[in-house]
Amino acid sequence: MPLGLPLPLAASAHHVGCAVADLDAACASYASALGLARRTRAVRVESQQVEVCFIELRPGFYLELISPLEGNAKLARYLQNGFYHLCFLVEDLEASRAQMKSNRFVPLPAFESEAFGGNLCQFFLSPQAHLVELCQMGEGSFEALFIASLAP
């Protein structure tokens, strides 16, 4: 559920992203090992040069598996560790951006994400060098996209 300000962002936690080398194999093994049937087909996010798949861990919280498209060197370093980012849904990206910046989170360029129906998303680098993503979405919007993208 997206939140406006004042945050606690933790209440709007949406997904954790993990980088993988082989998206199809990772989606299949996670879904099978965890007994999770609800997952999306692969979605290309051209602006980030990645392909992603979401697996529902519990209602409203997902594991996003992320695989770099050919030539995407910036994601390659995350393949060593697996963890990539934590994402929160927000109602007002501009206001949330100001709050993140006031807490010394460095904003990276915002982008429209195909995985979120073209809605605006933005990554921030924390003072501890972790990536946090904020995506501006209306309430219930991602669930509708998720259902429409379920893998056969």
Label each region the model flagged.
Residues 32-39, 103-107:
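Conserved acetyl-CoA-binding loop of GNAT-fold acetyltransferases
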